[in-house]
Amino acid sequence: MIGPPTTVTATTTVTATVTPTCEPTTPPLQCDEYGYLIQYNSLYRVDLQTGAYEEVASAVSDANNVNAIGYNPLDDYLYGIANPARQLIRVSSRGEATVVSTFTQAQMGASAYVGDFDSEGYFWFGSGGSTWHQVDLRTPGSPTYGTIVARGTADVLGLGVADWVHIPVAGPYMWGVATGLVGGGSGTTLMRFGLETRRWEAVARYPVLAPGGFGAVYGINNGTLYASNNAVGEIWAFNVLGGDPYLASNGPVSSSNDGARCVLNMLD
């Protein structure tokens, strides 16, 4: 059920980083209907309606686990963080990775596992929702391209999200699904992080839908959020504009994972 949003304040700081520009040389994706799932270092293409999946690449980044992936609507590439190298990478349609930037631990922490793009081409990544970083990936060759232009911390209301997704029609937010309820107890909470306010809100709460967390989420620009459960592979569909979630399909069981898709493909 939809309840009144709960808000808290967040702290922010701004930083600048000098990073070499890296021009795309590998083929982009095509804004197709699929979700893209990264698990450790392997990339999969997932049919969210049927749960069927196939491997795109088995080794995306050398000697790293990739997480916090997002789909850039401006250039149709996937981007993510290669841990523990703290590299921002661009991933082609063939699963080939190119390093765009390398961050220090002081800039981004030890690792990251949530990530997605806003509509303007900024990449937002962090760890569990308690930290956030905004990277400029709008225009290759610009002075700030590939750099962290803002960062900060946020109170995730005693919960945590394992992935987040931007759905333009639903406003300036990143959306995620948390296990548990604000204040304690068992259940599932639909949450959103304000890109303008830098605050978390608990938007709706539901019973326990599946055991464990939802490590990969995907969006459609009609208000639909697909969340893949790690433990059993169930893919649940949430309407962030209101309504009850439903089981959409059964996909792969997964861990050390993250998801992304072209939110502008309406999955006809």
Residue ranges: model-predicted function:
Residues L48-G51, V91-E96, D136-S142, G194-R198, ...:
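Short loop/turn segments that connect beta-strands within beta-propeller blades
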Residues Y40-D47, A85-S92, Y122, G129-D136, ...:
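Structural motif
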Residues P20-V56:
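An edge-strand/N-cap motif at the start of beta-rich repeat modules
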Residues E23-P28, A63-L74, Q105-E120, A154-V169, ...:
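Repeated scaffold domains used in trafficking and secretory/extracellular systems
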Residues S228-D268:
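Blade-level signature of beta-propeller repeat domains, shared across WD40, Kelch, NHL, RCC1
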Residues Y34-I38, Y77-G80, Y122-G126, Y173-G176, ...:
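Conserved beta-propeller blade signature
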Residues P5-T21:
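Extracellular mucin-like PTS domains
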Residues A52-V60, A97-Q105, T144-D155, R199-V208, ...:
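A short beta-strand motif characteristic of beta-propeller blades
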